[in-house]
């Protein structure tokens, strides 16, 4: 079975999407619609050279979403997924590309998500750290022993877990994890503790927007971050999406489940090749590629 997977925040780069805009009338239309929907010219930032402007959460998230979704659209009849998944933000790209959400509704939700997350980060300064070379259980136990908020946020692949929490909590966790034998426990240059209870204000704000959005039947199952299982019911998808901002991204479990369900090849749709690399850590022989024009 063929899967298409969609990257999350961090995959952005200056000039992203310009080739799509220049190559396709459909892409042009979608980018113009995006500028109208967002109320600012995101194409100027995406197609420009200013990496700092692109790093703002309110820009980064819609930019990655647009790159992924428009690339899938430009593929036309070649885009025939039998299963889809997206890492964190990428789940929204996957939902639009598989037909569960309209392009405009998906973009509005992503924009609302980005703004709400930005606000939550400003209200409650916090951070994340990547932990390499320890069993999940060891990391989970150490996190649970710390009195401040520290939780597993992204299960990226075996031996790579990102934790999320208060600045002081992450500081303590990194020290304890290094003592426990982690190959690395490094703070990440992110704006806040994504996928942790500290994102509750953003989750509540996004929930209201999700509630009034129409979700439809899709063309194939989506493997969602909070369950790591194949789901096709629009109402169930909606409920899982509401939990996503404060729950762990179960990406390792998602990859393992897709493979168990008959995955034979995976194509990454959007900027970067991070997800292909993670799949290779689970199954070196798996056929993987990037979607191209």
Predicted regions and their residues:
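Non-catalytic positions within long, well-ordered alpha-helices that form the structural scaffold/packing
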Residues: 76, 178, 259-262
């Amino acid at each position: 079975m063929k899967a298409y997977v969609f990257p999350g925040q961090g995959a952005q780069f200056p000039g992203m999407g310009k080739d799509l805009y220049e190559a396709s009338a459909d892409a042009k239309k979608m980018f113009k619609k995006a500028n109208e929907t967002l109320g600012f010219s995101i194409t100027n930032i995406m197609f420009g050279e200013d990496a700092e402007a692109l790093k703002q959460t309110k820009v980064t998230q819609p930019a990655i979403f647009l790159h992924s979704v428009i690339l899938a659209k430009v593929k036309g009849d070649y885009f025939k997924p039998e299963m889809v998944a997206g890492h964190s933000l990428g789940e929204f790209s996957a939902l639009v590309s598989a037909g569960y959400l309209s392009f405009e509704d998906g973009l509005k939700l992503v924009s609302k998500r980005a703004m709400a997350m930005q606000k939550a980060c400003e209200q409650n300064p916090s951070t994340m750290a990547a932990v390499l070379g320890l069993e999940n259980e060891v990391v989970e136990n150490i996190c649970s022993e710390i009195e401040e908020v520290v939780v597993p946020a992204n299960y990226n692949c075996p031996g790579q877990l990102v934790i999320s929490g208060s600045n002081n909590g992450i500081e303590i966790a990194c020290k304890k994890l290094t003592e426990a034998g982690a190959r690395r426990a490094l703070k990440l240059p992110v704006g806040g503790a994504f996928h942790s209870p500290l994102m509750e204000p953003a989750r509540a704000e996004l929930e209201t927007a999700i509630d009034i959005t129409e979700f439809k039947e899709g063309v194939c199952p989506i493997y969602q971050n909070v369950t790591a299982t194949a789901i096709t019911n629009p109402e169930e998808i909606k409920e899982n999406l509401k939990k996503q901002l404060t729950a762990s991204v179960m990406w390792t479990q998602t990859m393992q489940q897709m493979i168990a369900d008959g995955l034979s090849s995976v194509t990454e749709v959007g900027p970067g090749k991070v997800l292909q690399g993670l799949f290779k850590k689970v199954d070196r022989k798996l056929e993987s590629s990037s979607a191209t024009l």
